[in-house]
Amino acid sequence: MRLGVLDVGSNTIHLQVFDAHPGSRPNPSVSHKVELRLTEYLDDQNNIDAEGIKALREAISGAVTKANIAGTEELLPFATSALRESKNGSEIIREINKEFEIDLQVLSGEDEARLTFLAARRWFGWSSGRLIVIDIGGGSLEIASGVDEAPEAATSLPLGAARLTKQFLNGDPYTEKSILRLREHIESQLESVLQAKAHHETRDRAIATSKTLRTLARLCGDWFDGDGRTIKLDSIRKISPKLAEMTLEERSKLPGVSPNRARQIVAGAFVAESVMRNLDIDKLEMCPWALREGVILKFIDWQLR
């Protein structure tokens, strides 16, 4: 069957259409993405403003049209932290569902972590043993670990790259003071993960998903003679301050770094470094599957019941 996944995230609105059948690998056939940066439309009361709502409606309208043209039999739309945490998010979702006749659902942070973990487990297989899976999104950080398809521990923290950039970083290049405040905040937020560190200590493989981490893996590979498919702690320790010293224009000229990603990559790098250091992870392996694939896999599993 042809399934569409509509991911309403903090950075982008991303439609992916898959040809998916029980017992087979989901094959992507159509991809449509609009960079939106919803977090930049939040006002002082944590409401998405009128301009942001308009941009969101236009992006979803385009995605729904693309899904219909692609012959999508079932559309699975979901929203993550930007709509989940905005004060008027529920009202916006009701209006969108009514206007476009879809069923946009909000995923909890824990759901994000669990579905991403499922995708990583299916990709690497049972022989990969105990996994810890890390995803740095625009609005939140997800960490999950376990030996089965459902993780034993799943955590979501407000440490997304877009959120932190807006909240802490200023100047071009970013000021040392704002970088220091950012790093102190990351460390304080990670305390809750460290309290549950026992869940993550024994592992066979540490896995990374998300565009932010893929970009960092590529940069680590280019700068430190890596393979572009892993992130080593030693490399991320070196790359984080180098990125922070660059201007926005300089970062946007780096391979694989879009202008939008150039704003956020500094915060993402410091989150990655802090997570790896605090959880004693020497190396992260990149996984090409993540949340959207997890949603597809969960839907197929549900159909088989």
What is the predicted function of each stretch?
Residues P77:
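Dinucleotide-binding Rossmann-like beta1-alpha1 core, especially the glycine-rich loop
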